[in-house]
Amino acid sequence: PTQGSMLLSGIMLKMAVYGVLRYLLPITPLAIGGISGEIVIILSVIGIIYGALIAMISTDSKRLIAFSSLSHVGLIVAGIFASAVVTMRTGLTFEGGQGAIIQSFAHGINVVGLFYCADILYKRFKTRDIRKMGGLAKVAPKFAILFMIILLGATGVPLTNGFIGEFILLKSVYTYNHIM
């Protein structure tokens, strides 16, 4: 059910991010500064790419949102660990943690809104196939505008709630490695 997806993606995924920030980083800072942190960053980048590629070919609206969420959480984890590795090696500020908190909050709002909109669309069109959901702006223009605003926030367009956190996380990954 959609409510379960909203709960899992909007709140429960953020519990893992909180656990990493609150417990894992303070308990094992030296391991994260070494090869373990780099392995997590590489796996996170692989998760970002995998989630984005599967989301791009997906036609099921809930599946698309779920894999997009996987990609966002991969970015959050990559930003946290990249910033932690840079902090351990150079003593710079830990901005990835700040970006992770901001992005977790923004992503929680956006993904709950997307799942809610997907449920409304499913009830209207009786399908989750996005190829069969044309003409929404003609029948429900206010809903189409709201859906577009939520989509823009989820993609991290400037002047939306998803931009600030994504920018900070991408900056921390870029500080760690200019190629990634």
Regions found by a protein language model. Give the residues of each.
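Hydrophobic transmembrane alpha-helices and their helix-loop junctions in integral membrane proteins
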Residues: 1-180
